Curated annotation (Swiss-Prot):
It is an enzyme of class 3 (hydrolase). Gene3D superfamilies: P-loop containing nucleotide triphosphate hydrolases (3.40.50.300), Translation factors (2.40.30.10). It comes from Mantoniella squamata (Unicellular alga). Transmembrane segments: none annotated. One of its GO terms (cellular component) is chloroplast. GO terms for molecular function: GTP binding; GTPase activity; translation elongation factor activity. Its EC number is 3.6.5.3. The lineage of its organism: Eukaryota, Viridiplantae, Chlorophyta, Mamiellophyceae, Mamiellales. Belongs to the TRAFAC class translation factor GTPase superfamily. Classic translation factor GTPase family. EF-Tu/EF-1A subfamily. Keywords: Chloroplast, Elongation factor, GTP-binding, Hydrolase, Nucleotide-binding, Plastid, Protein biosynthesis. This is Elongation factor Tu, chloroplastic. GTP hydrolase that promotes the GTP-dependent binding of aminoacyl-tRNA to the A-site of ribosomes during protein biosynthesis.
Length: 235
């Protein structure tokens, strides 16, 4: 469920597959889940290239990955596939954190991977003009400060001091946004696309949970009847 929760908020993904072992059962499961929750673009990293002595074997793994992606309606023939070794790149960067391109072939492959991400996965247009809406992914408490709800802002903007509604399970409740934080930086405003922690006053941790939403007052109403599409994964 954690994979689904995270994937549902992604603009794109890097699929990591062992170049030595090829796609595993969980690889196909992750591709399926990415498709069902609407991840629009995928870039592939063939890890552990250093453990593969035969270039033809690595090519076969790449073909298998492309075929698997195509079978789940991703454009397997067009998706960038970058081989490399995350471990050797990490070891090199640990020794020399400020390494530049051209100094180490394994680090260069990580640069190539990120270039592929930048070129293949487009920057999405953010819907900042509509009213604020954020699906709650997780909740925790900060002693002496209040309750924090985390998630991605789906649309609109939210500012410190705004009064918003918590909608979902139970009665709709009003709360005040007293703080915003993203990547350990405090913000005055958060906009659509931000993965943010929202500090709330007027509610306890036990009264809010994953699946509920934060929204501008009066813009969202809960429903008890709806149509849905359900995918059941067999073990």
């Amino acid at each position: 469920k954690n994979m689904i929760t995270g994937a549902a908020q992604m603009d794109g993904a890097i699929l990591v597959v062992s170049g030595a072992d090829g796609p595993m059962p969980q690889t196909k499961e992750h591709i399926l889940l990415a498709k069902q929750v609407g991840v629009p673009n995928i870039v592939v990293f063939l890890n552990k290239e250093d453990q593969v002595d035969d270039d033809e074997l690595l090519e076969l793994v790449e073909l298998e990955v492309r075929d698997t992606l195509s079978s789940y309606e991703f454009p397997g023939d067009d998706i960038p596939v970058v081989p490399g070794s995350a471990l050797l790149a990490l070891e090199a960067l640990t020794e020399k954190p400020a390494m530049s391109a051209g100094e180490n072939k394994w680090v260069d492959k990580i640069f190539a991977l990120m270039d592929a991400v930048d070129s293949y996965i487009p920057t999405p247009e953010r819907d900042t003009a509509k009213t604020f809406l954020m699906a709650i992914e997780d909740v925790f408490s900060i002693t002496g400060r209040g309750t924090v709800a985390t998630g991605r802002v789906e649309r609109g903007t939210v500012n410190c001091g705004d009064v918003v509604e918590i909608v979902g399970l139970g009665d709709t409740r009003e709360v005040t946004v007293t703080g915003l934080e993203m990547f350990q930086k405090h913000l005055d405003e958060s906009v659509a696309g931000d993965k943010v922690g929202v500090l709330l006053r007027g509610i306890q941790k036990d009264d809010i949970e994953r699946g509920m939403v934060l929204a501008k007052k009066g813009t969202i109403t809960p429903h008890t009847k709806f149509e849905s599409q359900v995918y059941v994964l067999s073990k």
